[in-house]
Amino acid sequence: ELAEGQLWEAFMAASNFELDNLRVIIDRNGLQATGKTMDRFRIGDLEGKMEAFGFEVKVIDGHDVEEIADALDWADTVKKKPVCIIANTVKGKGVPFAEGIASFHNGTLTQEQYDEALRVLED
C-alpha cells in the first residue's frame, strides 16, 4: 500500500489546497505481489499519517457494502479537508485457495481455479 512517492506528494497538495471534493480510498489488505506489505514498507500508523497530512479519516470494513456507502455519505459532509477512507480488506476473501495469499495479487487463474472461485462466491 502506498509505495509510490507521488501519492504522498499528492496527499500534501490535497490538504494544502483544501480539496474537500477529493475522496481517497485505500484498500488496506496488507499484501503486495512479493509478500506482506509490512515486510517491505513499514508504514506504521496509516490513519495518523493521513490525519497529519490534513485529511479527515474513516476506517471501515472494506467488505461491507453498507459501511462503504455510509463512509461515502459521511465524506460528503466534510468541508475544507480532503477525505481518506481506509478500507480494511482481505485479498481473495471468500476464495479458500487465494484468501490472504500474496501470490494471487497478480497473474492469471487457471480455468480450474476460476471455476472454483466462481462456485464458492456464488454459494
Regions found by a protein language model. Name each.
Residues 1-123:
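Glycine-rich ThDP/TPP pyrophosphate-binding loop and its adjacent helix/strand module
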